[in-house]
Swiss-Prot record:
Annotated CDD domains: NucS-like (cd22341)
Source domain of life: Bacteria
Family label: Belongs to the NucS endonuclease family.
EC number(s) from the headed UniProt entry: 3.1.-.-
Protein name listed in UniProt: Endonuclease NucS
GO CC, alphabetical: cytoplasm
Its biological purpose: Cleaves both 3' and 5' ssDNA extremities of branched DNA structures.
Phylogenetic lineage: Bacteria, Bacillati, Actinomycetota, Actinomycetes, Mycobacteriales
NCBIfam families: PRK03298.1 (NF002876)
Location relative to the cell: Cytoplasm
InterPro entries linked: Endonuclease_NucS, NucS_C, NucS_N, NucS_N_sf, Restrct_endonuc-II-like, tRNA_endonuc-like_dom_sf
This protein's encoding gene: nucS
The keyword Hydrolase belongs to this UniProt entry's keyword annotation: yes
Molecular function GO labels: DNA binding; single-stranded DNA endodeoxyribonuclease activity
Length: 230
């Protein structure tokens, strides 16, 4: 992981063109080759980014006499020929660190069992639902459950024991990525938990994500009437 806080401008050249004027930003270069540009807002969302596989070349800019002027041009290019051209005027801070292989999110026993049970009884989410697979792999981690509704539309399900805002944000990231896949989109989201905090429910509904309150005992086959769908 390489983190660079720098004064820079950014130009995207590809299917369309976009420009970010000169300003202080965070440049994040990950070991997988991805590069993203962040401002001090927008939560986790970058201003612009390039996903792997891509290449990064850094070249000093020179004047007409061939002398370096203290400015560097970063060119990030993917296989399609799309480019991020980052003009780095000044680096304020730079840090590189090998984070190693991340073990990923580890669910507690109840969450893992909820996922297993919901996959077995996927029609809990609605009549006509069918399971695609558990732990559907993506570039940013596995989606708990990927399924299809009665109309054949793709649905991504995030399962939590206690549903809070972090879980909604996590599902939102999955949806943003999955909806770029021509074979899957449009992808809807379901946030499922034994208990969903009011703030999380409000955020989910604002983003068009359906909330499902799960009764663990019902899914285990024990009589209960507390399963509620929203």
């Amino acid at each position: 992981m390489r983190l660079v806080i720098a004064r820079c401008s950014v130009d995207y050249i590809g299917r369309l063109e976009a420009h970010l004027p000169m300003a202080d930003r965070l440049l994040m270069v990950k070991a997988d080759g991805s590069v993203s540009i962040h401002a001090d807002d927008r939560a986790y969302k970058p201003l612009n980014w390039m996903t792997p596989p891509c290449t990064l070349t850094e070249t000093p800019i020179t004047d007409e006499d061939g002398e370096e002027v203290g400015v560097h041009l970063w060119v990030v290019e993917n296989k399609k020929g799309e480019q991020l051209r980052i003009t780095v005027e000044k680096i304020h801070s730079e840090l590189s660190h090998d984070l190693g292989v991340d073990p990923g999110l580890v669910k507690d026993g109840v969450e893992d069992h909820l996922q297993e049970l919901l996959a077995e009884h996927i029609t809990t989410l609605g009549e006509g639902y069918t399971l695609v697979r558990r732990e559907y792999p993506t570039a940013i981690g596995p989606v708990d459950i990927l399924c299809r509704d009665a109309d054949g539309q793709t649905v991504a399900v995030e399962i939590k024991r206690r549903g809070n805002i972090d879980g909604v944000e996590q599902l939102s990231r999955y949806l943003e990525l999955l909806n770029r896949d021509e074979l899957l989109k449009p992808v809807q989201g379901v946030f499922a938990a034994q208990e969903i905090k009011p703030q999380a429910r409000t955020l989910a509904e604002d983003r068009g994500i359906r909330c499902v309150t799960l009764d663990y005992q019902t899914l285990r086959g024990i009589e209960s009437n507390e399963l509620t769908l929203f």
